[in-house]
Amino acid sequence: MKYDIRQAAQALVSQLKAIDYERLPISKYNKRYIARLKPVLSYYMKIYADCILKGLESIGSSPEEITLIDYGGGSGFLSILAKQAGIGRVIYIDLNPDSVDTIRILKELVNTGPDI
């Protein structure tokens, strides 16, 4: 299990770094936000993967049985990783409507993402 989530995180980093965010129809705010994350994306993905692993270990359920709520989801990268790692249901919540639009676009580009 640990290897799968960490492997998914590494693969996702490659996918996300390959995206030209400046060409996407997303807000300037989100372009700046993601541009600041991009150089340290591997670092954050490792943290996200570790959080998912610790959560799964403490709950003791299989990933497919879990609902993860990404409250204040920002870039949505945690939501994408959770879904890619096999979490059953992923709910993304952010008060910024531009961030919600961005995660919808990213979900199409990487072929996975939050359910809501």
Task: Report each predicted region and the residues it spans.
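Conserved N-terminal segment of class I S-adenosyl-L-methionine
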Residues: M1-I116
